[in-house]
């Protein structure tokens, strides 16, 4: 897929990050993954992200990621697949090349591990990855990789295949300056945990879409919220927030890492054998799974 084609797809509707299922030995389970991707592709997400943050990219080895992307691509029924990419620069370059070779439509470049870096170093890191591939690159602005306006402008000027900017900082002043400065050069994606909680604010800051984690297990609910948001139907948005998203936020906030573990539990509750999360994350307790089951019961499929 050409970078600008991916850019248009990213901005055309709701996005999501499927979980990565593991078997009893903790290995990638392609059969369950393919079935889950096939199910999700029947809803209205315009791009799916394989091995992204919700897909536990941080717990995957670099050589696992291309196979996960290829499996998603084969099962997605034409929905574009973007692969998660990260680590130090050399590792990220190799992962990006592997995703491109596996048939992925682009990458999401997650922050480098552990180390903080100055803007000049972040520029060099992102540019090296962009230069290594021909497809579209979306940079994830959060944690150790918070790009300032001047840096993202420079990258947009120097990297034609940089087509997306995803924000997970919640710094609306910064991101509004970026959207005002770069205009339609990039597609802007909301990337806060449980992004629906922040979607109205990000829409006002120039972000047309976001990645929905709960789309993994209540896809119709996620689509209904997105449609209400884009239609300016605040009453429907608030109804869904009160009935589902605020209680889900309370559950998700019980432990660090539950932003991923709770999603995987929801996928299991919908009948997909997604397995456990890999360390250092931990699964929900049985009591917490029961709470989640009650929460999703009205939208059980």
UniProtKB/Swiss-Prot annotation:
Q: What is its EC number?
A: 4.2.1.41
Q: Which domain of life is it from?
A: Bacteria
InterPro entries named in the record: Aldolase_TIM, DapA-like, Dehydro-deoxyglucarate_dehyd
One function term, GO molecular function aspect: 4-hydroxy-tetrahydrodipicolinate synthase activity
Q: Which UniProt keywords apply?
A: Lyase
UniProt-listed CDD domains: KDGDH
| Known catalytic reactions | 5-dehydro-4-deoxy-D-glucarate + H(+) = 2,5-dioxopentanoate + CO2 + H2O
Record SUPFAM superfamilies: Aldolase
Tell me the Gene Ontology biological-process terms attached to this UniProt entry: D-glucarate catabolic process
Pathway annotation? Carbohydrate acid metabolism; D-glucarate degradation; 2,5-dioxopentanoate from D-glucarate: step 2/2
Pfam families in the cross-refs: DHDPS (PF00701)
Family as reported in the entry's similarity comment:
Belongs to the DapA family.
Q: Which PANTHER family does its entry note?
A: 5-DEHYDRO-4-DEOXYGLUCARATE DEHYDRATASE 2-RELATED, DIHYDRODIPICOLINATE SYNTHASE
Protein name, as recorded: Probable 5-dehydro-4-deoxyglucarate dehydratase
Which species is this UniProt entry from? Answer: Allorhizobium ampelinum (strain ATCC BAA-846 / DSM 112012 / S4)
Q: What is the lineage of its organism?
A: Bacteria, Pseudomonadati, Pseudomonadota, Alphaproteobacteria, Hyphomicrobiales
